[in-house]
């Protein structure tokens, strides 16, 4: 009881229920990697591996945290992934946890990620850390509380090493907010890391943190994951609380994990998920942890697939990635059918809600970059917003109706390569918005309908840029989507050691 009470004591007052986390992650760590483990190789281990090393007292939280802070000092100016590095508080937290370990018996239980570093997207509040929302004028704005998802990550034992850069207000699928370094793709530094969780993706892909939190309101976890050869999971609507704030975007946005493996994403989802008092919509917790069910065979499934969503088309490289996954699915015995829906009617209402989110931010428009200013200026009236919500809900019913015929849908994450750094800066705001719509059209349907969706790596194109596909599931079918993604991951990558881009290898 003392351990549970200790965990609950770190939570803000508005968090009335904390789900116990009894599952043992030692079953999911990679013992093969431990055989040749060296202290310089932490960045090649998963968050689950690191948690097991701490649990078995092979390394201390302080050693791991210092290692990652050293990598941040060495590489972050290259990739531009962090808006704020918590040099002092991260070390203080790791020292406290190391001291705590020294005073307890080896058999006493620990929170599942005790002493494992994590990064938080700079749209979320971490008490006593800056929260700028990607607005340079707010760089010194200190948060006075923890968001609900942050409180849960702290209670799970994570050490927060900083805040990752986001596109301004989370508005864009690329991360180049004025006044911050752009988030670069660690696999090809001329290209953007995607967005809006671009900093989180760049940090994980470069091995600056083992795992990170992001959020997805139109592809903002899946797009950077696809850009950076990561796993990015957008949970079902209501799976993860947005406490303590309300929701003014009609449930299109949610928190989600960015990681290098599907099992890690499932484990972080187990930490994030669950009702917090007053949530406007919520799902019951699963009977078993996602990290357990993810490793199980999903059975023979009926899958739809599409190489693009009309009215847009995708590049040959993207179509090749989808074809590769289709072949894997056929070899596994899944039933496949080419089928999709048209997203033309979704564009206008989704854009209206996007604009309204900027207008409702409360940040004066002159402090924002030109595209956000234009979005705010054209956000319309409350009636325009409500009509957009109604129309989106009508279209969402059609999307969910389509999904009732299938267990999952396989799609691209985006339609062509990501933009290079600065490639769109010379364009007018309306032209940038049109570019965005054309690029990430496969992502918003899952947000509009509240469906679970995951991006998984498939390989690389001839320019060395990552290729990816997404899997979209039925409402609340998070476990099945994760299990299918894990099955695909095993077929595509096997049990090969985790790799980093060459220049970021230890």
UniProtKB/Swiss-Prot annotation:
Annotated family: Belongs to the amidase family.
Query: What reaction does this enzyme carry out catalytically?
Result: a monocarboxylic acid amide + H2O = a monocarboxylate + NH4(+)
Name this polypeptide is given: Putative amidase
Which SUPFAM superfamilies does the UniProt entry name for this protein? Answer: Amidase signature (AS) enzymes (SSF75304)
Has UniProt tagged this entry with the keyword Hydrolase? yes
The record, for Pfam families, names: Amidase
Which EC main class describes this enzyme?
hydrolase
Q: Which residues form the active site?
A: 121 (charge relay system), 196 (charge relay system), 220 (acyl-ester intermediate)
Fetch the Gene3D superfamilies from UniProt.
Answer: Amidase signature (AS) domain (3.90.1300.10)
């Amino acid at each position: 009881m003392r351990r549970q009470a200790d965990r609950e004591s770190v939570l803000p007052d508005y968090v009335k229920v904390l789900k116990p986390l009894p599952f043992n992650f030692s079953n999911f760590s990679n013992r093969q990697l431990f055989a040749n483990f060296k202290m310089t190789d932490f960045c090649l281990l998963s968050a689950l591996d690191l948690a097991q090393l701490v649990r078995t007292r092979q390394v201390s939280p302080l050693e791991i945290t210092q290692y990652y802070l050293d990598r941040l000092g060495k590489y972050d100016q290259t990739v531009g992934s962090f808006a704020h590095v918590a040099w002092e508080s991260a070390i203080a937290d790791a020292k406290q946890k190391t001291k705590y370990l020294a005073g307890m018996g080896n058999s006493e239980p620990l929170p599942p990620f005790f002493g494992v570093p994590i990064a938080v997207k700079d749209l979320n509040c971490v008490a006593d850390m800056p929260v700028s929302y990607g607005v340079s004028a707010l760089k010194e704005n200190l948060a006075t509380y923890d968001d609900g998802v942050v409180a849960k990550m702290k209670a799970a034992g994570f050490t927060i090493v900083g805040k990752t850069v986001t596109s301004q207000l989370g508005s864009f699928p690329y991360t180049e907010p004025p006044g911050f370094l752009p988030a670069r793709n660690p696999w090809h530094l001329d290209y953007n890391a995607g967005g809006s969780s671009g900093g989180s993706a760049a940090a994980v892909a470069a091995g600056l943190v083992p795992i990170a939190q992001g959020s997805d309101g139109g592809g903002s976890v899946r797009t950077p994951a696809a850009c950076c050869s990561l796993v990015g999971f957008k949970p079902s609507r209501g799976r993860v609380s947005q406490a303590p704030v309300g929701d003014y975007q009609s449930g299109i946005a949610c928190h989600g994990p960015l990681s290098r493996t599907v099992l890690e994403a499932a484990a972080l989802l187990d930490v994030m998920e669950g009702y917090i008092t007053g949530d406007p919509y919520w799902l019951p917790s699963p009977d078993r942890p996602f990290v357990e069910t993810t490793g199980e065979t999903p059975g023979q499934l009926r899958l739809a697939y599409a190489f693009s969503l009309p009215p847009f088309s995708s590049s040959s490289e993207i179509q090749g990635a989808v074809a590769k996954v289709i072949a894997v699915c056929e070899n596994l015995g899944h039933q496949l059918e080419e089928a999709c829906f048209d997203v033309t009617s979704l564009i206008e209402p989704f854009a209206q809600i996007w604009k309204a989110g900027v207008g409702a931010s409360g940040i004066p428009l002159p402090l924002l970059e030109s595209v956000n200013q234009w979005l705010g200026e054209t956000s319309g009236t409350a009636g325009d917003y409500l009509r957009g919500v109604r129309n989106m809900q009508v279209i969402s019913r059609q999307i969910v109706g389509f999904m009732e015929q299938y267990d999952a849908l396989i799609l691209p994450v985006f339609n062509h390569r990501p933009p290079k750094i600065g490639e769109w800066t010379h364009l007018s705001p309306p032209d940038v918005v049109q570019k965005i719509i054309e690029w990430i059209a496969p992502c918003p349907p899952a947000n509009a309908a509240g469906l679970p969706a995951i991006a998984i790596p498939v390989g690389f194109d001839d320019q060395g840029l990552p290729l990816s596909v997404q899997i979209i599931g039925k409402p609340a079918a998070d476990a099945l989507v994760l299990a299918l993604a894990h099955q695909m991951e095993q077929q595509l990558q096997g049990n090969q050691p985790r790799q980093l881009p060459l220049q970021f290898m230890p």
